[in-house]
Amino acid sequence: ARGYKSCLEMCLFSGDIPESVYHSLIEAVHGAFPAFYDYMALRRRALGLEQLHMYDLYVPVTENPYQGITYEQAFELVFKALAPLGEEYVSLLHRARDEGWIDVYENQGKRSGAYSNGTPTCHPFVLLNHQDNLESVFTLAHELGHAMHSYFSNREQPPIYRGYSIFVAEVASTVNEALLLRYLEKEAGQDRKKGAYRCNL
């Protein structure tokens, strides 16, 4: 850790992350452990297992009331969920959809997964592999978070400040996911199936 007070400081330096932020994150995660353990115990019981393994985390514990969500329906959910971010933000989401910023469906030779790539001279591009399910709705919200982050950064910042670390990048995408989850919780209301399905996320 030459030139640094610690190996931790050295590792955080390139992302411009203060050690206090790192320690706050660790503390917050540790604080959430009891709720996480309760959730895992509930999942284990719901699946009727003596021991829960990593692969069990992907097994649905309830019927899926969200199966068959088309891309168009997914976008409507995302529009509504992200409305708190303001009119300009939502209008840019419309542009992204209408102006071909997004490659939506699987195709031969297309890379799997989902990605967003911002460019300094034009709008961002988003690659999806939409599957008509709730996970794809969250993926759409997540990748649009990256795309909008790049769009605003490129528009508002001089070139030297346009880039950002992965630590910062994931804030915009995770905020979008949190807003989507909050919106879905509100919409589910007393619908037990929709409420219970959150256990699968």
Q: Model-found features: residue ranges?
A:
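Cation-handling catalytic/transport regions enriched in His/Asp/Glu
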Residues: 1-201
